[in-house]
Amino acid sequence: MTHEQIFNQIKGGLIVSCQALEHEPLYTKEGGVMPLMAKAAAQSGAVGIRANTVRDITQIKQVVDLPVIGIIKKDYPGTPMYITVTMQEVDELVACGVDILAVQGTGALRPNGQTSAEFIRAIKEKYPDQLVMADCDNIENALACAGAGADFVGTTMRGYTPETTGINDVDFGFIAQLARECPAKVIAEGHIHTPEQAVQALYAGAFALVVGGAITRPAEIAARYTAAINNHK
């Protein structure tokens, strides 16, 4: 797909995050589960998929004809960065054909000392035709990432960094601020649990939105039900 085709495909739509980490119930060594989630999402009208690991991305692209936002989650000593942290992971994601490559775009440094903006600039220099999304937490980091060449900025890390501790719900004001001030296209992601919140995120100015836990993580979904029930006993 061309960049314009990808933009037209995902604009105003739902991108479903299909991920299972090793400690989660839907994880298997062989894979095969996340492609089924992606098929269900596609059948339900999703406009794209967000996926983690080359294995899952490759399997998903074999069964759905939707743009894929690809990441590789990996912990590194000495840094809180864990979403597509090094150029090695970038190389792997580009090689497997991700449509949009997502990286963590917060204020911490990568293991080699690079800022998020420096890392994105290096990606764009190496892969000038690759669409890049920065998973951000605040306006300063989003603007820096967009200035470095990020095509999309996501609200993915809002509430998950020391600078944004205590934000445990969708920050519609932040989405609106990004839409006003940031030149990159805004992807609302994180803390979106209901269709009503999804619609409100689009009204706030999001170009598109990503939902994962409320759709593809049954343990989280069930936990919300049981917590609500137990609170009313």
Residue ranges and their predicted role:
Residues 1-95, 126-132, 140-147:
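Conserved N-terminal beta1-alpha1 strand-loop-helix module at the mouth
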Residues 1-3, 21-23, 172-233:
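Alpha/beta catalytic cores of nucleotide-metabolism and tRNA/nucleoside-modifying enzymes
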Residues 28-29, 50-69, 80-87, 105-123, ...:
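Active-site-adjacent beta->alpha loops and helix N-cap segments on the catalytic face
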Residues 47-48, 67, 99-100, 131, ...:
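Residue-level detector of anion-binding/catalytic polar loops
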Residues 78-93, 137-149, 184, 188, ...:
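Catalytic cores of alpha/beta
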